[in-house]
Amino acid sequence: MTFYLLRQRLLLLFLCLLFPVVLSAGNASSLNVVILGDSNTWLGGEYCTGQQGWTRWFVDRFRPATCRSYARSGATWTHTAATRHDLRENTERLSDNNVVFNQIERLIDDCNKGRQIEPQLIIISAGTNDAWFPKQRAEVLSCSVAQAFEEPDSIFSHRTPETVRSLAEVVRYDCTLLMRIFPHAQIVLLTPMQSTAIPDLRLFAVAETIAQCGDQLSLSVVRQDKESCVSSARERTARCFTTDGTHTNIEGARRNGYYLANRISSVLQW
């Protein structure tokens, strides 16, 4: 085989391997995306333009029709005995009502009032604060995933927010709510990235709970705790991709945003 023919075949093979990725990214151009989460998502701003947030770089590569973030700094999945439906609170700190559930409620309210296009893709990136603040979220790991899915949907769906306090229960509660209201939307769960502020075993326990809930609900899960550029061991030695061991700097946000665009493109169902 001549060098010319070999080069042509290698080029053809490369294009064949590249085509599914390009096709997947192209499909995103018609998608309206909504992102829920905590501070690393909130850093990108409501319309995903902040360079220190991964969402800005995600949009740059994923190129959806629209992308809006409802994330809040300090947000958790888990609830407390005082958690209530709350559309108004806008704090950047841990609080009873600064939870993913209320981000969902704001999304639903905005869609009902014509302020937000119904999303085809919903991404939820949370869990850092659930692992970080065990005293304020004491019941985070109080229930196993198996226990959280024992109650029939017909009963579980009627529970009120303050009665759903463990991480496993809340992930089920929030995701099934989204599935009822937006039945055609694809939901992707992102586990939290590693952090120097959180013992690795505790963070991994939170991430594993989220991942197992995703499996139970047949949702795609991206394991940021295992795959992202942020390593707690490396950040303890020197700040490479974070400003403080938890929150991404611009380079960390860029790498993570591009990585998430590629990973989510690979599981896109549209």
Residue ranges and their predicted role:
Residues S24-S30:
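Boundary at the C-terminal end of the N-terminal hydrophobic targeting segment
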Residues S30-V34, N40-E150, F156-S157, E169, ...:
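Conserved SGNH/GDSL esterase-like catalytic core that processes O-acyl groups on lipids
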Residues W54, Q103, L167-V170, D174, ...:
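A general structural detector for well-ordered alpha-helical segments in enzyme core domains, enriched
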